[in-house]
Amino acid sequence: MNKFRRVRVVGHDVRVAVRPGTEAGPPLVLCNGIGASLDLLEPFVEQVDPRIEVMRFDVPGVGGSPGPKVPYNFALLACFVGRLLDELGYDRFDALGISWGGGLAQQLAFQHPRRCRRLVLASTATGSLMVPANPLVLAKMVTPRRYRDADYASSIAAQLYGGRMRQRPDQVRHVLYEQERLGSRAGYLLQLLAGVGWTSLPALPLIRQPTLVLAGSDDPIVPLVNARIMRALLPNVSLHVFDDGHLGLLTAADELGPLVSEFLTAQTGGTPR
């Protein structure tokens, strides 16, 4: 059962959902994609081992969190999330980031090396220095229209998300709309700006945490080659390629939820979770 609450962090109200775990251990902190509220991740959360506590939040300006007072970048946002975790009483944590949230998760691992225990990167890349998507795909991501217009989202689902959406583009209505809360257009723009000029490429060799990279075999937004680049640069990494597209963490949650759970609960060097 998820517990929803609002947490005050450096003058901002942040909407948070916590699914308590049945055992003690670091929580899994979920960092969502651009423009997406925490509700979108529910299909994945349902597939995560119940022993693991799962925390997710709406970035300021997205979903149920009011807009930020000033623009931010990933470094500032990682500091902000660190303060949020302090307010929630979390010392150590595991981080999972999907798409845009993968950039935030990498920044968290880099800035909080003693607190971030393990890292999961799903359908994401290294920021501005990456193998980019087709320009026609990128053009469809400039605005949050796909979150506001179900017919439009269905019409572009195959080209934008790939994977299972190529055969069943109408499924995007279920994935994006059933539980989605809209943020402001300004909030979406600020998320775009946060990534301008940011790259994790030179920092990847310094991220020592055990890392699991999840990549779809048919992801138009983040081509698979980016995951292979990350595998080459991260010092303690495993790569899992799944047969789906950019939204695979949601549409293939029955496969990826248990896989992530196994990675997080595995013992390393005799130290239990």
Positions of PLM-derived features:
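Flexible "cap/lid" loop of the alpha/beta hydrolase fold
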Residues: 106, 110, 117-146
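Catalytic histidine-centered segment of alpha/beta-hydrolase-like enzymes
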Residues: 244-257
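Conserved alpha/beta-hydrolase catalytic His-Asp/Glu region
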Residues: 150-203
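Conserved alpha/beta-hydrolase "acid-adjacent" motif
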Residues: 220-226
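Conserved HGGG/HGGXW glycine-rich cap/lid loop of the alpha/beta-hydrolase fold
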Residues: 12-64
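Active-site loop/oxyanion-hole signature of alpha/beta-hydrolase fold enzymes
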Residues: 56-96
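Short beta-strand/loop motif that positions the catalytic acidic residue
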Residues: 207, 213-215, 219
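Gly/Ala-rich beta-loop-alpha elbow adjacent to hydrolase catalytic centers
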Residues: 97, 101, 105
